[in-house]
Structure formats: structure tokens, C-alpha cells
Amino acid sequence: MDSLEELKQKIQKFVDERDWNQYHTPSNLAKSISIEASELLECFQWNDTEYDLSQVKEELADVFNYCIQLASVLNLDIRQIILDKMEKNTQKYPVDKCLGKSTKYDKL
């Protein structure tokens, strides 16, 4: 399995070979994440139980791809920002207050 760093390198090679860096501004990448997330959501439109898994995989890959590119353009360590966010979520959602609940942290 490829490491995250190897995936980043493969994605960057793909972009470089096509001279697309000029289009991959933080703003454009953020927009692309939203667009692809909407396409992912569309896979589940009107039916929560029947969906085309191959299409879900395609759209999910697009979302991850753009997220990885945005983090790279902004020089962010994906692993670290996820760990940092998990730590914040651990504080905001203590198990003893939120176990089995979907309540937002400020309403616990």
C-alpha cells in the first residue's frame, strides 16, 4: 500500500505533467473539494440504501485527491492536522457526555 507521501508524489506528478499547477490555487482547490463533495452526495440522492458503489468510490477519490492537493499547496502536514483536530474533538466531545448521542458539543 502506498504511504500518504507516495500518494502526494503521484498526485503532484500527474498535475506537473499536465501543467495544472497554475490552476491549483487554494481557492480553486477548495471550490473543487466542494464540487466533488456535492457529486459524492448526489450518489445518495433520493435513496439512502441503493447506490452505485463504483461511482461513490470515484467521487470519494476526487474529494480526497483535492484535499491532499490543497494541504500540499498550503504546506500542511495532513497527518498532523488530523491528529490536532482529533485532539480538539476529544476535548469537545468527552465520552461520558456524548456516548450514543448526536448532540452538538455546545449543547451537551
Residue map of PLM features:
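Flexible "arm" and connector segments at domain edges
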Residues: 1-60, 64-108
